[in-house]
Amino acid sequence: MAHALVTFRDVAIDFSQKEWECLDTTQRKLYRDVMLENYNNLVSLGYSGSKPDVITLLEQGKEPCVVARDVTGRQCPGLLSRHKTKKLSSEKDIHEISLSKESIIEKSKTLRLKGSIFRNEWQNKSEFEGQQGLKERSISQKKIVSKKMSTDRKRPSFTLNQRIHNSEKSCDSHLVQHGKIDSDVKHDCKECGSTFNNVYQLTLHQKIHTGEKSCKCEKCGKVFSHSYQLTLHQRFHTGEKPYECQECGKTFTLYPQLNRHQKIHTGKKPYMCKKCDKGFFSRLELTQHKRIHTGKKSYECKECGKVFQLIFYFKEHERIHTGKKPYECKECGKAFSVCGQLTRHQKIHTGVKPYECKECGKTFRLSFYLTEHRRTHAGKKPYECKECGKSFNVRGQLNRHKTIHTGIKPFACKVCEKAFSYSGDLRVHSRIHTGEKPYECKECGKAFMLRSVLTEHQRLHTGVKPYECKECGKTFRVRSQISLHKKIHTDVKPYKCVRCGKTFRFGFYLTEHQRIHTGEKPYKCKECGKAFIRRGNLKEHLKIHSGLKPYDCKECGKSFSRRGQFTEHQKIHTGVKPYKCKECGKAFSRSVDLRIHQRIHTGEKPYECKQCGKAFRLNSHLTEHQRIHTGEKPYECKVCRKAFRQYSHLYQHQKTHNVI
């Protein structure tokens, strides 16, 4: 068994303050990724020392450089001072780890790989630096590393592109060794006039103008300007996600992604907008949000005129018009124009829903679905339309609503020329012409055009009714049903019938009611020719011909063709009668029964005969009365062929034949 003395110093990457200032934002993010991953690998080898300050700062997303000291003495926590270097020799920070030679070599390869990413970038930088001292430092450093690797044959080496300092030398001498960097010298780009602190940053910037991309991915052919970008990109092909959230188990390709994700669980939003006091998880989100106040939108689509704040979103949008979908699901072959859409789609196959609502226990595949769902409990509607003041739970709902005011509909159907504001709406609409129903119920085989309709349908089988009325406790399968139901408690009825003065909570109720006066029955049964005022009545009627009775009572086994009949029947077993008359105290199991009963007290008779002017409380009474004028007798006795206007009369007659 081989024994190796491994310290955090062996896998740390050190920079002076001036060297740190030369790194751009992307390089600093890479430094954070490499340092954290190396430390995690060291812990997996058995390192049990106290967590270094630099790791704590990096995990918190803070700047790792200490600013309390003067310019020549400042250093990053990765740069060890004489005091800290001596401290490493104590038993507290050096641990003897018993590992097999093979396992050490395997981990060593991983650490070298992570360090090499950063080493290549830093060595590239030294090629552009004009300071001779920095070049000499780079050469001497390579010699030291080479010497260390050749002499430490017995002990496996974990050396990356480390800066190995003599503990007897001061930090000032260390800075001299690394070369002097004159921060006063500015370098201007001749193309656009941008100014940079050093030649390296200028050279990287100029690649934007030249379009130079020297690093190519062998898997997909995508090219990158920097080697570290290629290395990070390759993780998408390998599927490597080394950073795992301990709260929900979700894994990430980069540490900053994990850091941003963890803020979802903590609820911490450290980046505040000074204009509206809105909080955000990341600085990027805040930057994007600020453009709402400034109105800056620089990228315009030539096809439809839509403008975007970021070029990233603009390029994604362009794929809608070109039809390009480069991201394909390996499970089902479905392709997507945006990588994020593929990532979300893949969770359908895994079935993983790690985000759970603490209020109702409902789980979601994506965190923002949970965030949107929570607003239903809190009653929050943070997205307000500036045109009409209407508020929404979800930003997407607001964006859809805005098209009402703008009237822009750039996506037209090629079959019927109907136009839509969103490509997704057009895609769904096209299924009407193609007959495509991609969402199938595994229980009964019924297929649907929309996933949301399938989800609602599946609740018929599961019996789940997640939407509960806080006023009366009644539950519903569909959100739209509870929205309609809530208006029962408000008593607001803004829709009034001009003929009889009756008021309704909803416009479509008024439309259906007006057919009573006009006699219009647009929904006709193809089997028997019977017509109906409402589509729902026709659908229920069709079940008579099919003999289908899908609603079974678990208490007594009785089956029903209509859901309404089934719901009414269940109240026999429960005895629940939530609708009470304020006049006489009589209670009813259905609101419609209460409404009909109240006409006894009010004297209301909305159904009037056009022949003689007689009025009735119920539409069925009017129908029976009209048969006096028409002479219609639809109920015939099968024994003697005598016919009757009302079913009750036939029932009484059949007793004479001893049929009943």
From Swiss-Prot:
- What ranges of residues constitute the C2H2-type zinc fingers? 187-209, 215-237, 243-265, 271-293, 299-321, 327-349, 355-377, 383-405, 411-433, 439-461, 467-489, 495-517, 523-545, 551-573, 579-601, 607-629, 635-657
GO annotation terms (biological process): negative regulation of DNA-templated transcription; negative regulation of translation; regulation of transcription by RNA polymerase II
Keywords, in A-Z order: Cytoplasm, DNA-binding, Isopeptide bond, Metal-binding, Nucleus, Repeat, Repressor, Transcription, Transcription regulation, Ubl conjugation, Zinc, Zinc-finger
User: Which Gene Ontology terms cover its molecular function?
Assistant: DNA-binding transcription factor activity, RNA polymerase II-specific; mRNA regulatory element binding translation repressor activity; RNA polymerase II cis-regulatory region sequence-specific DNA binding; zinc ion binding
The places in or outside the cell where this protein is found are: Nucleus; Cytoplasm
Q: Which Pfam families match?
A: KRAB, zf-C2H2, zf-C2H2_6
Crosslink site: Glycyl lysine isopeptide (Lys-Gly) (interchain with G-Cter in SUMO2): K109
On the tree of life, the source organism's domain of life is Eukaryota
- Which positions fall inside the KRAB domain? 6-77
Give the record's GO CC terms.
cytoplasm; cytosol; intracellular membrane-bounded organelle; nucleoplasm; nucleus
> Which SMART domains does the protein's record reference?
KRAB (SM00349), ZnF_C2H2 (SM00355)
Q: How does it assemble?
A: May interact with MVP.
Role according to the record? May act as a transcriptional repressor.
The entry sums up its family as follows: Belongs to the krueppel C2H2-type zinc-finger protein family.
The name of this protein is: Zinc finger protein 540
This protein's species is Homo sapiens
